C-alpha cells in the first residue's frame, strides 16, 4: 500500500485537519466513531482508503494523522468534538504554552521540547504502514507554531525519512486580513528553513478564499469554518487519487515529477471549480468545458496573483465525478487555442490529467452545493513569485527598523538568520524570474560548448 501520514500543525493546521477528516469520513462512509457500516463494504470492495486510514482489529478506522499544537485549546476542541472517538488520544499532541506568534519559540525554545514526542508518534504510525509514501504537512506561515515548529519538524523528518516525499499545505498570510503583525517575519523564516526539505508546497491565501466565499457562495462574513471547508474540498481533490480507484490515478511522487521542474520551484498554484452555492446549482449545468475554463479565471485561485502576467511551467488537472477523457481533451484543446496561456518555451506540452470517478462529496448543511463533477487544477506558474514579492516587501519595511526583532533574538535566534532568510527569498524570486526567461535569448553563451 502507498500510505500517507498527515501532520497538522498549529491552530490553522489543526482546524483544516478537522475539515479534511470530516470530509474524508463522509467520502468513505466512515462514521464519527471510526466504524464503517457493513453494508458499505459489501458492494464497494474499494480499500484504497487505507492509504489514509488504518484499521484496528475491532474494525475501527483510524486516520493516519497527527495533530500538534504548542498550546492545548484548539486540539481540546478535537478531543471533545464530534470526531473525538475517531482519533487515538496519542495522535493529539499539545504543549502547555504557545509559540506566541514567534517563529523562534516554535523552532527553538518551546518547539524542541515537544518535537521528540511528535516524531515518536509519527514513527509509530510509520511502523503500521507497509509502504509509506510520504507526509502531508498542514500549517500556516504566519503563526509561531505553524512557522517555527513546522520547519523544525520538516528538518527532522528529512533526517529520519530521507527519501519519503513531503508535501505542504501552507496558509499564506492574507494581505488584508492579518492575525499578527509579525507574519512577514515568520513566513520568510519558515520558507527559508523548509525550502530544502519540502518537495512540493501548495499555498493557500486566506484572502483569496475569503473572496471566493463572498463572491461564489454569497457568504457576507465568512468564518474560518467556511474557509476551511472550502480548503478541505481542495485537499480532498488533490488526495482523491490516493484514496479511490480511478481511471487515471495520480500518485504523490507523480505530482512532483510533473509539477516541479527544479527543486526550489515547488510552489504550485491550486484552483478549484465549481465553487457554487446550493441556490445557484439548481439553475446551472456545469459541463466539463465550463469547469475547466473556470480554472483559468484568476478569481478561482487559492493565491492572489495573476497568471496572465506569468508563464506556466506545468499544469495538472484533477477531475472527479462524471468525466470522460474525451470531454477533457476537448476542453483542454479549446483552452490551448482560445486562452492566452503562455507556457515557458522549454516546456511545450504541459497538461497532465487525472480522472477519478468518485463524485465530490459535500458536508451536509454546508455552503457548497453537491455537484456531479469538479476539477482541481495545480499549475506551476512564475506568477506566484508575486506572492513572495509582497511578503518580502513587508518584511523589508519592518526589518529596516529592526522592529520586533528583539523578541526573536530573546528566544535564542541570531539576527543573522533574518538576513540569511531574506537573501534566500531574494534568490527564490530571482529563480522564478530566470525560469520565465525564454531560452532562445541565451544563445550567445552556448558558443563555447
UniProtKB/Swiss-Prot annotation:
Residues where Mg(2+) binds: 71
GO cellular component, one term: spindle microtubule
Binding-site list for GTP: 11, 71, 140, 144-145, 179, 206, 228
Pfam families in the cross-refs: Tubulin (PF00091), Tubulin_C (PF03953)
Key words of the record: Acetylation, Cytoplasm, Cytoskeleton, GTP-binding, Hydrolase, Magnesium, Metal-binding, Microtubule, Nucleotide-binding
Cellular compartment(s): Cytoplasm, Cytoskeleton
Domain of life (superkingdom): Eukaryota
PTM comment: Undergoes a tyrosination/detyrosination cycle, the cyclic removal and re-addition of a C-terminal tyrosine residue by the enzymes tubulin tyrosine carboxypeptidase (TTCP) and tubulin tyrosine ligase (TTL), respectively. Acetylation of alpha chains at Lys-40 stabilizes microtubules and affects affinity and processivity of microtubule motors. This modification has a role in multiple cellular functions, ranging from cell motility, cell cycle progression or cell differentiation to intracellular trafficking and signaling. During the early stages of oogenesis lky/Alpha-tubulin N-acetyltransferase 2 is the main acetyltransferase responsible for Lys-40 acetylation in germline cells while Atat/alpha-tubulin N-acetyltransferase 1 is the main acetyltransferase responsible for Lys-40 acetylation in somatic cells.
Site entry: Involved in polymerization: 449
Catalysed reaction equations from the record: GTP + H2O = GDP + phosphate + H(+)
Enzyme nomenclature, EC number: 3.6.5.-
Enzyme class label: hydrolase
Main location: cytoplasm
Modified sites of kind N6-acetyllysine: 40
Gene Ontology MF, one: metal ion binding
InterPro entries: Alpha_tubulin (IPR002452), Tub_FtsZ_C (IPR008280), Tubulin (IPR000217), Tubulin/FtsZ-like_C (IPR037103), Tubulin/FtsZ_2-layer-sand-dom (IPR018316), Tubulin/FtsZ_GTPase_sf (IPR036525), Tubulin_C (IPR023123), Tubulin_CS (IPR017975)
The keyword Cytoplasm belongs to this UniProt entry's keyword annotation: yes
Cofactor: Mg(2+)
Positions of the catalytic residues: 254
Gene Ontology BP annotations: microtubule cytoskeleton organization; mitotic cell cycle; unidimensional cell growth
Biological function: Tubulin is the major constituent of microtubules, a cylinder consisting of laterally associated linear protofilaments composed of alpha- and beta-tubulin heterodimers. Microtubules grow by the addition of GTP-tubulin dimers to the microtubule end, where a stabilizing cap forms. Below the cap, tubulin dimers are in GDP-bound state, owing to GTPase activity of alpha-tubulin.
Subunit structure: Dimer of alpha and beta chains. A typical microtubule is a hollow water-filled tube with an outer diameter of 25 nm and an inner diameter of 15 nM. Alpha-beta heterodimers associate head-to-tail to form protofilaments running lengthwise along the microtubule wall with the beta-tubulin subunit facing the microtubule plus end conferring a structural polarity. Microtubules usually have 13 protofilaments but different protofilament numbers can be found in some organisms and specialized cells.
Family membership: Belongs to the tubulin family.
Protein name: Tubulin alpha-2 chain
